[in-house]
UniProtKB/Swiss-Prot annotation:
Name assigned to this protein: Beta-galactosidase
Catalytic site: 457 (proton donor), 533 (nucleophile)
Reactions catalysed according to its record: Hydrolysis of terminal non-reducing beta-D-galactose residues in beta-D-galactosides
Quaternary assembly: Homotetramer.
Provenance organism: Oenococcus oeni (strain ATCC BAA-331 / PSU-1)
Enzyme Commission number(s) from the entry: 3.2.1.23
Binding site for Mg(2+) 2: 593
Amino acid sequence: MTNKISFRDIINRKDWENPVITNWHRLPIHTEMNYSKSLNEDKQKTIQSLNGNWCFSYFSKVTDVPENWADRDLTKSNIMPVPSNWQLHGYDQPIYSNVAYPFPANPPYLPEENPTACYSRIFQLNDDWLQSGQNHVIFNGVGSAFHLWLNGQWIGYSEDSRLPAEFDLTKYLKSGKNRISVMVLRWSKGSYFEDQDMWRMSGIFRDVEVKHLPATYLQDYQLQTDLDDDLDQAKITIKAQVAGKNFSQNKLRTRLYFANEKVADQSSRLSTRAVDERGPLDNQFIAELNLKDPYLWSAELPYLYQLVIELLTDDGDILQVEKVNIGVRKVEIKNGLLKLNGKPLLIRGTNKHEFDSKKGYAVDEETMIQDIKAMKRNNFNAVRCSHYPNNRRWYELCDQYGLYVVDEANIETHGMVPMNRLTNDPVYLPLMSDRVTRMVTRDRNHPSIIIWSLGNESGYGRNHAALYNWIKQSDLSRPVQYEGGGANTAVTDIIVPMYARVEQDQIESVNSKWSLKKWIGLPGETRPLILCEYAHDMGNSLGGFGKYWQAFHKYPRLQGGFIWDWVDQGLLKKDVNGNDFYAYGGDFKDQPNDRQFCLDGLLFPDRTPKPAMHEVKYWQQYYLFNLQRNPLGQAESFTVTNDYSFKKSSNERLHYQIKSENEIVIDKYIDLVLNPGESLLIKLPKGRSSTSSLLDIDISLIKGNSWAPSGFKIASEQYVLAKKFGPTNAVTAATNKISLIENKDTNTFEIKLDDQKWQFAKNSGLLVSWSKSGNENLLDALRDQFTRAPLDNDIGVSKVDHIDPNAWYERWKSAGMYNLKTNLVSIDAEQLERAVLIRTEHSYSNHFQILFKSSKIYRIDANGTMTVTVDVSLAQGIPFPARIGLTCHLADQITDVSYTGLGPFENYPDRQSAAQYGHWQMELDDLYTPYIFPSENGSRGQVSQLEFGKQKISAYHEQNFSFNLSRFSKQQLARISHRNLLQAENGVWLSIDGYRMGVGGDDSWSPSVAPEYLLSNNYYHYAFQWCRKDI
């Protein structure tokens, strides 16, 4: 199409609704190029950035854009930074949606209200650039479609938010000032293919730059590394295409360096190798470099060679130089296993959106490096670019630091009914082909990319089959994966289910999810299985994570998975008081929205880790431990195994300690020298005290590396050798007199001991007062509790207008557990010689149905210790409760807490493998986990002793407990929608639980707490002792 087209014709033509038009005049995509003229030339000599402030005008629909907008006076315009999303700068609104389209779905058509923004800026190029060669502008990310003008001349059009759009400006540039103008539409028919679970935002959100190309230049090049079966001979093939003028006599010189030393080189002319019976490509160079005993790239050892490619004239003058880091490695599926360099991989992966809480899609390099270092420090080795190609710099960093990458096409039609409505329609094949073939062409030279993905949640259509075949013919070096259509269709080389469970089948009318164990055993199924999504970390989650890793280690064809997902997508926003808070769906009055479903990362939006990250790091660690005991059960030795596939232990120091209750008995260090898969047996010294309780082991880096400092802990383990630390439960001999009084004025049983007083209300049977020297300890009575402030996993998919009756929260509410009627069955008191006993029995009912019965014995001894013994029975058929415990509101002004139990971080019964038993001290506020959507949080389990303020609580008869101490009541946590709205209450809320349900986390939309972590018994017993420390 000619460039001479009026603005009105562009508006009327509606390219953004034409299903077969994806671009006008956009240049073919290629691998990243710098077009340098010498080996050490500064990039700024061939690349000019157009990032910065652009003039900006916003319109609610494209038909409102004035015809002369590109010629308007820029001094009267608003300013918009590039890169950015305009919704984060006061225009329009972000929309968070998981599945539903943010507009009426009628492909390829779009609503008239289609927000449109017009960007303009002035730039000036070096006059030398205008004398010869070409000048191209590259927009690396624009959502969702745009038209481009230069100096009033229409240049072209492009779609696909996540891949570069390059245009030739050469003919329309002038000396001096040039005006570039871009009209960006929020929605296009491409938006039907960009229905990912994310904030929907728009704008120019990646770099914009102008590049100067020589008159004759390298148009693209493709690298291919081949290894022989012994992996000691490598061939690197470079296929380069040249474009421009008079290139028939040009030469290509390739040189390969490792650690600044040249290891191979070759010069070549245009290839005469025939492609088919009609002959060779007339613009292709082919070079082959051979290596003996190459250093092989892996995520563990990311060895990179530097390849220098020079385009030369016939006389040897340099026209263009490109430098690129390359990795030599071999990816294959063999014998049912995904292998790298001949060894099976175990994918320790995470999904990752491009997201920044302040900048939206505009993620900068500093944040990318921060993410990669955090991944490496927490034992990740892989990342899935969910669900679109990332910024080009991301792949370079993954090459450098060492991460395996699944590169995913920008295709998701989750909101279509059926899901494959578009992907099965040949009309949309060109659009889909654009997104797949351009991704592969741009990114194929990165060693970190080991798998291509056809997209996400788009059903299974004929177009997928066509694109799968294209990739398999175009790139022989990588497998292809795709989950849509059931995770095991003909267009995936790997079974890639979402949220399949280890042992439980999930039967659906279409595309059932088999258990992992069943899937790999299906008749005729020989492919490896890697979960493309699992372990949904929404809020307080990731319970049962270890079951997956036990299965991964047991069954070779279960080769890991990608956790959902990396970082909470909470956008920083100001509340009515001007304070920052993290917003989720609906906070911008966005419709439709999926509320807090965007808060499902391992990191909070500020990229601080959630407690669940400890569990992930533990199960993904590269060193495995095993304790050996003799027939008498005594620990004699332990082994440590190097679970790396390629990396020898040479920079790791093992440290182990054996601790008794009061001292460190043994403290030793060993510098490890272990080959991959090799184990070391470490014998424990004999003659240890029989009271030695714990064996603590950790492995740390001796020297710092690219992602962690010296001394950084990469693996840990703890074994209980004997009885755990804890109180003896011995009652101190008491001489003080304790008395029981029935106070008719207050209708209480009153126990007095020196200046302490306990009061039990006769009409409620509750401990309603505990004072010392007239200072009250309780603000509210000590009560049974069976519920928790609901987790996201408890709520499931329930909404105000859509209730999921299967969700735990709905079950608990339907059973009346949040509104139980308490009935005192009996209360009696007994004076003993050195103690007072209070016995109570309560029933808890809903609509005359008794759900729980609780019997308690309070023994208050003359030494001031109150022993509480509780027996709870559950009615048949009621929903399993969240907890069996007691709670009260304390008057103490607590600042510090110490306890002996699992810690130091938050842990729950199904998420405590990483927690270690010990004595922990912290501030009260450090017990709180600031989940953006408030819920139950802050638990510490397996506690034998707890001290706070002037209080001490101890386990009784070796039955440990869990506790919470919080400035927020359970009721407030359940009621408030955002953490910034929580109000610290007077005093502190204490929960002491004998039993707690797990948190679950296989997914967040169906009950996922494993049976062994449910409170499914009909009877529970627990006890503890409570006293003041200042008696």
